[in-house]
């Protein structure tokens, strides 16, 4: 069988807390795009083999994303699509702030843009260098595990890397309103899109920034917080469609 490759912008896939490039393996199997122009990346601080990983910062993560954009040849004439899951929204919001012209479209996967001044865990004790993946019972209180088998959860536990403390404590400082003009796809999984928009209009801290976006598409993909494992084929289709959009 011959696989048809879709023409699209370059694509960068960035998973959230505790995850690396490996989290996108199932999606990549279904993403019929040019593999030379599609990169699943591991953010600094989430490489288990990095002896300095607990000291990595948001600045390190932003620099790494910009480096991948450069390697893909992203430019104002040929910008890339960035797919950001969950807690990857901090560094990706900063990338949109500093180089919006390099981004064709941002796809937030059960995630969204952060507001300036926000931090994921500002009260994290100074003596805590990193935050390991919590127990599944606690994790389920924080995010939906719907659609994840025992096998998938075991793999998550085995491969998860503790999140570096500096990344969790640092506030995200944004100054460039041009970030809001980047075309955006909001993939709503654990909370329906209509509810997300209502929360945004009500000024909910987690979603308020959504109301400032100039070009927004909302896609409902009902499942848990990790759709790259529970609905990889469907998520791949959403990503492929977003990357191929011309406006």
Predicted features along the sequence, with ranges:
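Conserved loop-alpha-helix segment in the C-terminal half of the alpha/beta-hydrolase fold
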Residues: 193-222, 234-242
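Active-site nucleophile elbow and catalytic-triad environment of alpha/beta-hydrolase enzymes
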Residues: 158-177
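Flexible "cap/lid" loop of the alpha/beta hydrolase fold
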Residues: 97-98, 102-103, 107-142, 202-203
């Amino acid at each position: 069988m011959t696989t048809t490759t879709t023409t699209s912008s370059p694509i960068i896939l960035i998973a959230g807390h505790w995850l690396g490039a490996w989290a996108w393996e199932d999606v990549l199997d279904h993403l019929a795009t040019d593999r030379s122009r599609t990169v699943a990346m591991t953010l600094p601080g989430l490489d288990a083999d990095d002896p300095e990983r607990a000291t990595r910062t948001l600045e390190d993560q932003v620099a790494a994303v910009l480096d991948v954009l450069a390697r893909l040849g992203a430019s104002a004439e040929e910008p890339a699509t960035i797919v950001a899951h969950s807690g990857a929204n901090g560094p990706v919001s900063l990338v949109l702030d500093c180089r919006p012209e390099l981004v064709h479209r941002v796809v937030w996967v059960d995630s969204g843009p952060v507001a300036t001044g926000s931090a994921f865990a500002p009260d994290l004790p100074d003596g805590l260098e990193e935050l390991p993946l919590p127990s599944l019972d606690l994790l389920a209180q924080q995010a939906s595990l719907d659609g994840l088998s025992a096998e998938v959860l075991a793999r998550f536990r085995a491969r998860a890397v503790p999140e570096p403390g500096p990344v969790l404590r640092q506030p995200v400082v944004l100054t460039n309103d041009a970030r809001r003009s980047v075309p955006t796809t909001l993939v709503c999984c654990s909370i329906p899109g209509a509810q997300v928009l209502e929360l945004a209009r009500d000024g909910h801290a987690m979603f308020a920034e959504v109301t400032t976006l100039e070009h927004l598409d909302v896609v409902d993909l009902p499942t848990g917080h990790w759709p790259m494992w529970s609905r990889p084929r469907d998520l791949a289709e959403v990503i492929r469609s977003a990357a191929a959009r011309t406006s």
